[in-house]
């Protein structure tokens, strides 16, 4: 009998006096990113650039196309190769009416040092909160950005998404795609 009373007391403490299981609120799950597609409105962002400016996507709307080349991590081999490709061939990209950036979830200080080391003549954007990377669906399970490039038209809509970026030829590939997507050339 004594064991039955102890068991009943333990059960009451575990389930509460009313016999209901206590409910602890489940932690809020991060909203899963909807996969962006060609024709979708590109999510707006405001990110710090290595040029010391804040870059807001909507500021370019109606003025020029935008290319955002996401990369995993500053100072790593593939990212270094991609940055060098874009820096060494910037004159070809600048033949188009386009603002182009590399972007990562690295902090601004790391990206600034990386850009200076690789002599990048274009801004690298920092998204340390990972909010923009999440909105673009590029955040991988390790918390780094996937190497994807987004081509965004003057109207703010996505013209193309390159999910097979080749770091060594990224600049040449970017120029080819800008032509394919009908981005106007500068005069």
Q: Model-derived features: where do they sit?
A:
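A short beta-strand-turn-helix
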Residues: 36, 45-65
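Thiol-/selenol-based redox modules, centered on thioredoxin-like
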Residues: 145-187
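Positively charged n-region of N-terminal signal peptides that target proteins for export
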Residues: 1-4, 20
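Short active-site neighborhood of thiol/selenol oxidoreductases, capturing the structured segment around
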Residues: 59-80
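Structural microenvironment flanking redox-active thiols in thiol-disulfide oxidoreductases
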Residues: 75, 80-118, 129-134
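Bacterial N-terminal signal peptides
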Residues: 4-14
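N-proximal helix/coil linker or "cap" segments that precede and/or mark the start of modular domains
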Residues: 18-44
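Short loop/turn microsegments at loop-to-beta-strand junctions
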Residues: 42-43, 65, 146-148
């Amino acid at each position: 009998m004594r064991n039955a009373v102890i068991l009943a007391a333990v059960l009451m403490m575990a389930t509460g006096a009313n016999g209901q299981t206590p409910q602890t609120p489940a932690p809020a799950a991060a909203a899963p990113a909807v996969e962006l597609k060609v024709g979708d409105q590109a999510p707006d962002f405001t990110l710090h650039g290595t040029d010391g400016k804040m870059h807001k996507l909507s500021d370019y709307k109606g003025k020029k196309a935008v290319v955002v080349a996401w990369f995993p991590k500053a100072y790593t081999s593939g990212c270094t190769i991609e940055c060098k490709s874009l820096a060494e061939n910037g004159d070809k990209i600048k033949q188009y009416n386009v603002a182009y950036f590399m972007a990562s979830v690295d902090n601004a200080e790391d990206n600034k040092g990386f850009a200076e080391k690789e002599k990048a003549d274009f801004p690298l954007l920092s998204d340390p909160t990972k909010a923009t990377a999440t909105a673009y669906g590029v955040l991988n399970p390790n918390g780094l950005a996937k190497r994807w490039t987004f081509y965004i038209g003057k109207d703010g809509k996505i013209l193309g998404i390159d999910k097979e970026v080749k770091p060594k030829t990224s600049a040449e590939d970017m120029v080819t795609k800008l032509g394919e997507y009908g981005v106007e050339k500068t005069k």
